[in-house]
């Protein structure tokens, strides 16, 4: 059965991968059309922002950056999940503090459902939640977490009195307030998904520490994560490459929807299934489990085909070459000779993060 599965899926897998380039080397006409359309949308979106905010002030949502515009693109909330900061800004010419106040409150109290928020419009579709996404990740000036509107409102007023800043972009005055997340904000977010990670780990036989390391590196546990290549969610799965491959292996037709991949449990399941496919099918010819893990990590970012081509254009010969090397040599080659600088850095980042999770 395993061999039959391998035969069924190995061809598309050899030229398709998950989250970097992003990620797939297969020519797929529908995917190209969708990608071109997405590129056009992003270009128009960025142009609208540049016209209002100025060239150096363009901010767009990314894997580790939540950016939401409102008020006809005059106000925006930016959560930088790497730096651990929330910055709310406005260029509104009238009552700027009122615009900031409203945006601060909504950002502090927003839920964790990415399907309910359009990050590529100025529609104010942010819903106040009884279980805010940022609860526990940010505290007010008294050191208390923020769950209710009353506390969020009081904190917003405090911020506007004590932390309001302004600068000029050459066109307009930008008013802003910055809030720091708590020092362990990354762990706070990761904790939300531990149960889902454990379930996927047991289902597909993938180490929990690897799943968590991939999530941290891909999105910093940001469920709203998007990318310039339209990779989606916590594990940055692309619908037309990794998503399609996983669906095919599970006997499903088509591709996962955006809403499906923005659901944390579905995203983690799909991303983990893809890791298992890379390990058990695509890169199964690599015998040493540590060497194979290095290859799987790099392939999740840049494609399995590109990993093997680092060693040989012939995939069987590539596996044989890897099998004659020590894991340390394989790691050294992948982090220095892979043609993609992003993939070289990716292996280092994920491997370092996985070591940290293993020590816990």
Curated annotation (Swiss-Prot):
Membrane topology, as annotated, equals: Lipid-anchor
The cross-references to CDD domains, in alphabetical order and at most eight, read: LT_MltC_MltE (cd16893)
- The answer, when asked if Repressor is one of the entry's keywords, is no
What Gene3D superfamilies does the record tag this protein with?
1.10.530.10
Q: Where is the lipid attached (N-palmitoyl cysteine)?
A: 17
Q: Which residue ranges run through the membrane?
A: none
UniProt keyword annotations, A-Z: Cell outer membrane, Cell wall biogenesis/degradation, Lipoprotein, Lyase, Membrane, Palmitate, Signal
Query: Which reaction is the catalytic activity of this chain?
Result: Exolytic cleavage of the (1->4)-beta-glycosidic linkage between N-acetylmuramic acid (MurNAc) and N-acetylglucosamine (GlcNAc) residues in peptidoglycan, from either the reducing or the non-reducing ends of the peptidoglycan chains, with concomitant formation of a 1,6-anhydrobond in the MurNAc residue
For this chain's UniProt record, which GO biological process terms are given?
Answer: cell wall macromolecule catabolic process; cell wall organization; peptidoglycan metabolic process
Q: Where in the cell is it found?
A: Cell outer membrane
Renumbered to this chain, the signal peptide range is: 1-16
**GO molecular function: any one?**
peptidoglycan lytic transglycosylase activity
Which EC number(s) does UniProt give?
4.2.2.n1
Q: Where is the lipid attached (S-diacylglycerol cysteine)?
A: 17
Protein name, per record: Membrane-bound lytic murein transglycosylase C
């Amino acid at each position: 059965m395993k061999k039959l599965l391998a035969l069924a899926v190995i061809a598309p897998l050899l030229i398709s991968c998950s989250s970097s380039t992003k990620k797939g080397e297969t020519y797929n006409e529908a995917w190209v059309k969708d990608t071109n359309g997405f590129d056009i949308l992003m270009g128009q979106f960025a142009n609208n922002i540049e016209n209002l905010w100025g060239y150096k002030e363009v901010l767009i949502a990314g894997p580790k950056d939540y950016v939401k515009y409102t008020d006809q693109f005059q106000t925006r909330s930016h959560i930088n999940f790497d730096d651990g900061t929330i910055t709310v800004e406005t260029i509104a010419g009238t009552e700027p503090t009122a615009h900031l106040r409203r945006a601060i409150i909504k950002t502090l109290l927003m839920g964790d459902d990415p399907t309910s928020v359009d990050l590529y419009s100025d529609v104010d579709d942010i819903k106040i939640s009884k279980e805010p996404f940022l609860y526990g990740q940010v505290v007010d000036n008294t050191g208390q977490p923020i769950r209710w509107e009353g506390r969020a409102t009081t904190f917003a007023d405090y911020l506007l009195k004590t932390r309001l800043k302004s600068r000029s972009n050459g066109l307009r005055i930008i008013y802003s307030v910055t809030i720091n997340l708590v020092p362990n904000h990354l762990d706070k977010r990761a904790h939300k998904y531990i149960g889902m990670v454990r379930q996927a780990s047991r289902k597909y036989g993938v180490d929990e520490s690897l799943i968590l390391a991939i999530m941290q590196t891909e999105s910093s546990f940001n469920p709203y994560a998007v990318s310039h290549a339209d990779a989606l969610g916590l594990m940055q799965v692309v619908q037309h490459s990794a998503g399609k491959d996983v669906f095919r292996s599970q006997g499903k037709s088509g591709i996962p929807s955006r809403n499906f991949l923005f659901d944390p449990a579905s995203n983690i399941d799909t991303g983990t299934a893809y890791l298992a496919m890379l390990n058990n099918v695509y890169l199964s010819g690599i015998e040493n489990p540590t060497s194979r893990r290095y290859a799987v990590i790099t392939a999740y970012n840049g494609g399995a085909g590109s990993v093997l081509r680092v060693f040989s254009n012939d995939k069987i010969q590539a596996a044989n070459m890897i099998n004659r090397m020590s894991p340390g040599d394989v790691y050294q080659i992948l982090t220095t000779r892979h043609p993609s600088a992003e993939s070289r850095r990716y292996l280092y980042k994920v491997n370092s993060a996985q070591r940290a999770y293993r020590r816990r």
